[in-house]
Every structure is written in C-alpha cells, then in structure tokens.
Amino acid sequence: MTSMIGQLHSVVIDAPDAHALATFYANILGMDVKGSPGDDWVVVTGAGYRLAFQEAPDLQPPDWPDPDRPQQFHLDIRVADIDEAEPKVLALGARRLPGGGGDFRVFADPVGHPFCLVWDA
C-alpha cells in the first residue's frame, strides 16, 4: 500500500444550474444543500461525504450510450428496493436510460449525466 498524499474532498459535477442539480441529488440521497439558487458553486453534504456542483452554462451533457458524447463519470447509488426507488427518482426529474442488469438500472439526471441505482441481487 502506498502512503496517502491527501484525502478526497469532494466529487464535483458540472451543471447549467448548480443549485437545481444539487437539489436533485440531495433529494435522492437525503443530504443537505449548502448554497442558494443562482450560486455558481453549491455543495451537498451528509452521510460522511460531499458532492459539489459548479455552474457550467455551456455544458454539453453526455448522450448515453452514444460514443460521440460519452459519459464523463457516473454515480452508483445503492438502494434497498429498486421498485420503490425508481418511481421516486423519476418523479424528481430523472429519466430511464437503456442498459442495466440484474443488480443495476441506468438513469440520467435532469442535466443528462448518467447514474445507476444499484442493489444486492
């Protein structure tokens, strides 16, 4: 094992509206939003980790699974019951994407970034 140089501070996600996308993920993860509408940097905290959202007005979101506009990252979000979780994320503005398997389903957040709901199959 190598020695630690530093610790992960946050995962930063680009969005045309940082506060709106932060609120989307905070609602899914049961976390708190630190920032206000119109801020160009908004943080979501809780559960021992943080996500940050930075305004990127010219963001060209990925178009899963199009290789010409591939994902830059994706989050795997563990859920206890996929059939209960899916309608909730859809109601928050997610949309279902092609793909998935016996223990995950693929979605896009309101900006177009893919994320997966995963569960123990």
Where does each model-flagged region fall?
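Short secondary-structure boundary/capping segments
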Residues: V42-V43, W64-P67
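Core segments of cupin and vicinal oxygen chelate
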Residues: T2-G6, V12-L51, E55-P57, E84-P87, ...
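Short, acidic, Ser/Thr-enriched surface-loop or helix-capping motifs
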Residues: D109
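Mid-chain, well-packed structural core segment of small domains
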Residues: P67-V89
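Short beta->alpha transition motifs characteristic of CBS
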Residues: G99-G100, L117-A121
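A short, acidic/glycine-rich surface segment
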Residues: D58-W64
